[in-house]
């Protein structure tokens, strides 16, 4: 009986394990590439955006856009008298 006694399924299992390892490595490389690309896009948009005095910028992926226009708090902040109603 030899030390290298292989069954027919050993080669199939080895090929499957190698393919899974190659796929995992490819997914890791693709994920890193996409992450770096998103960082580059986010950085270029941050440099192009203009921020007024006292305002803070939201992170790129957390900015929510609305078709209705500015929110109520921002409109109230822009009016000179504030949100109170005068009669």
Swiss-Prot record:
<keyword id="KW-0472">Membrane</keyword>
<dbReference type="GO" id="GO:0005741">
    <property type="term" value="C:mitochondrial outer membrane"/>
</dbReference>
<comment type="similarity">
    <text>Belongs to the stannin family.</text>
</comment>
<feature type="topological domain" description="Cytoplasmic">
    <location>
        <begin position="32"/>
        <end position="87"/>
    </location>
</feature>
<dbReference type="InterPro" id="IPR015137">
    <property type="entry name" value="SNN_cytoplasm"/>
</dbReference>
<dbReference type="GO" id="GO:0046872">
    <property type="term" value="F:metal ion binding"/>
</dbReference>
<feature type="topological domain" description="Mitochondrial intermembrane">
    <location>
        <begin position="1"/>
        <end position="10"/>
    </location>
</feature>
<dbReference type="InterPro" id="IPR015135">
    <property type="entry name" value="SNN_transmemb"/>
</dbReference>
<dbReference type="Pfam" id="PF09049">
    <property type="entry name" value="SNN_transmemb"/>
</dbReference>
<keyword id="KW-0812">Transmembrane</keyword>
<keyword id="KW-1000">Mitochondrion outer membrane</keyword>
<keyword id="KW-1133">Transmembrane helix</keyword>
<protein>
    <recommendedName>
        <fullName>Stannin</fullName>
    </recommendedName>
</protein>
<dbReference type="GO" id="GO:0016020">
    <property type="term" value="C:membrane"/>
</dbReference>
<feature type="transmembrane region" description="Helical">
    <location>
        <begin position="11"/>
        <end position="31"/>
    </location>
</feature>
<dbReference type="Pfam" id="PF09051">
    <property type="entry name" value="SNN_cytoplasm"/>
</dbReference>
<dbReference type="InterPro" id="IPR027435">
    <property type="entry name" value="Stannin_sf"/>
</dbReference>
<comment type="function">
    <text>Plays a role in the toxic effects of organotins. Plays a role in endosomal maturation.</text>
</comment>
<feature type="modified residue" description="Phosphoserine">
    <location>
        <position position="49"/>
    </location>
</feature>
<comment type="subunit">
    <text>Monomer.</text>
</comment>
<dbReference type="InterPro" id="IPR015136">
    <property type="entry name" value="SNN_linker"/>
</dbReference>
<keyword id="KW-0496">Mitochondrion</keyword>
<dbReference type="InterPro" id="IPR038747">
    <property type="entry name" value="Stannin"/>
</dbReference>
<keyword id="KW-0597">Phosphoprotein</keyword>
<dbReference type="Pfam" id="PF09050">
    <property type="entry name" value="SNN_linker"/>
</dbReference>
């Amino acid at each position: 009986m030899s030390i290298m006694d292989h069954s027919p399924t050993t080669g199939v299992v080895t090929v499957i394990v190698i393919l899974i390892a190659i796929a995992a490595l490819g997914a890791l490389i693709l994920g890193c590439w996409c992450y770096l690309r998103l960082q580059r896009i986010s950085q270029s948009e941050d440099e192009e955006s203009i921020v007024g005095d006292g305002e803070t910028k939201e992170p790129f992926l957390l900015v929510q856009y609305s078709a209705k226009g500015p929110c109520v708090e921002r409109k109230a902040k822009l009016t000179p008298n504030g949100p109170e109603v005068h009669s």
